[in-house]
Amino acid sequence: MSSNLKKEETMDLDQQEFNGNAISPVLPDGLKNYLIDIDGTITDDVPNEESWRMETCLPYLGSVDTINDWYSEGHIITFFTSRTENHRKVTEEWLQNHGYFYHNLLMNKPRGGNYHWIDNHIVRATRYEGKWTKMTKKKLNIEVFE
């Protein structure tokens, strides 16, 4: 992977404490950790069983510019995909060839959708529905613990 496409430096995050014990650091206000799917989100939905298509599919219109803008603004960009480790090389080359800037690539996301993420940090979900445009804020009902 080309060094200009992956930030190697570590972020200076404030170490937080809880009851005298160190806990995971938190991003500064205004910065986000973007976890972005690949297949069906920034390019065609290519299943692992048809991996020969991974090299030739094209990015969705606006995805490169939007993601690279977030990267330039200082946000953390992580691609999180159901592609297996066997597909890492072709995936990294595809991202590089199409000019995506990112920090991390996580493979082996569980397949099948219907994701339910439980975390002690704020989690926001945005469902991609066919168009890369500016984000807007809307209030919706969500499922929470009582």
Can you annotate each of these PLM segments?
Residues 2-146:
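HAD-like aspartate-dependent phosphatase fold
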